[in-house]
Regions:
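Ribonuclease/tRNase effector modules and their secretory precursors
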Residues: 1-94
């Protein structure tokens, strides 16, 4: 079964302008076998949000906030910070 994705088109455009990462690029992170998924309690309110960090098809290390239900709903996507990149590289494969 393949994942199905959805997002708000206005939010996607604003995200690309602000962070330089399109949601089309962001969904490719879900295909990275070394990607890591974490719960995001700080940003979870009435819904449980999660974060995935991994390499996109463009080889950018990308952090994606999402909600998983029948479909994966993207909330935001951006390139990982220097600190996030270091933590990812130290923990990948473990």
């Amino acid at each position: 079964m393949s994942l199905q994705f959805e997002w708000d088109s206005k939010k996607a455009e604003a995200n690309k302008v602000k962070h330089g990462v399109s949601f089309e690029e962001a969904i490719t992170v879900f295909a990275d076998p070394l990607a890591r998924i974490f719960e995001d309690p700080e940003h979870s309110g009435t819904e449980r949000r999660e974060i995935i960090i991994g390499h996109s098809a463009k080889q950018n290390l990308v952090l994606v906030s999402f909600v998983e239900g029948d479909r994966v709903r993207l909330i935001s996507a951006r390139k990982a910070t220097r600190t996030e990149r270091k933590e990812y590289e130290e923990n990948v494969g473990s």
